[in-house]
């Protein structure tokens, strides 16, 4: 957990019984408004911590509390970073208030940056499309972006929507065709669904009465073989029941990629 008060610029790690993990909290001297991402970078069997801060930095803190590296961007990082294992490399990715999306190597070097048209508050997510890793993120400019591991636009992307993208993009095979659909929400109260080529799925967008305020969560709630899409608005929780068979297994289908909320995802290529 990252601290955001003037006197609490620390990262906290807490055991299940409420006690501090040995060596924590660690004073990093930077305010952290969003969550962290976890992955064992030094292969010692203990997760390390990636965080973004209001000091414009994306940083890696090792499990012993040592700051391993820090990369300076052009403005505040107010989205939780994500760690994407492509099978060939580890990427650390996050959006910034300087309108740019950054992906770094596991050593903290810049792999690429991508300039959008507004602030990026959504955490990135990833999926395998056509045998390659695809990285998705949204911006306050209303666009959903999809890039490859070198920062190039994927065919059919970006897609402009009618409102700012307010949560991370999620993926599931909602129509049982063997390929993932791209699910998102925006500040115009729209639930959106796209194919991998950027074409919109039938019956979407579905418009709610109030703006959406978070990331979709997709799973088969009632065990009937089709999927439900859970979305939160500024007023209510909405559940959309898909009427064809589908699966969310193996996809980034929930906030931070998994039920442990680690922000880590391994793409099978």
Give the predicted meaning of each segment.
Residues 1-269:
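Extracytoplasmic/lumenal domain signature
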